[in-house]
């Protein structure tokens, strides 16, 4: 593990830090996930975004099943050290497991959440089943 990389990061009590994926060109927020120290190290080593799944209790590389990998162009750490922003190039233009560009596809309008972004590719086409 790279001590210089990790020492400034304030991982929570579960050993995780919030990781935000932002499109390097459009600046749109694509997704928010979690990283442990190993996922952060792997991200730096490979240049591709790796995360830690709280539900599956394991590290994973974005796109390992779908092919929608995230090439990291820049890593940024916030002033408190408890959140990371990755400026990324999104392979295939789809970051969300629902087949949308972004996981942030719902907009609050008139007292309700409305779906604002279209599905670019059906989940079943991406994963072979509903993810």
From Swiss-Prot:
GO cellular component, one term: cytoplasm
Alphabetic keyword roster: Amino-acid biosynthesis, Cytoplasm, Histidine biosynthesis, Hydrolase, Magnesium, Metal-binding, Zinc
Example GO BP: L-histidine biosynthetic process
Record GO terms (molecular function): magnesium ion binding; phosphoribosyl-AMP cyclohydrolase activity; zinc ion binding
Catalytic activity: 1-(5-phospho-beta-D-ribosyl)-5'-AMP + H2O = 1-(5-phospho-beta-D-ribosyl)-5-[(5-phospho-beta-D-ribosylamino)methylideneamino]imidazole-4-carboxamide
Record's function text: Catalyzes the hydrolysis of the adenine ring of phosphoribosyl-AMP.
Entry note: cofactor: Binds 1 Mg(2+) ion per subunit.
UniProt cross-references to InterPro entries, sorted A to Z: PRA-CH (IPR026660), PRib_AMP_CycHydrolase_dom (IPR002496), PRib_AMP_CycHydrolase_sf (IPR038019)
Phylogenetic lineage: Bacteria, Pseudomonadati, Pseudomonadota, Betaproteobacteria, Neisseriales
Family to which this protein belongs: Belongs to the PRA-CH family.
Record's subcellular location: Cytoplasm
Residues holding Mg(2+): 78, 80, 82
Required cofactor(s): Mg(2+); Zn(2+)
Protein name per UniProt: Phosphoribosyl-AMP cyclohydrolase
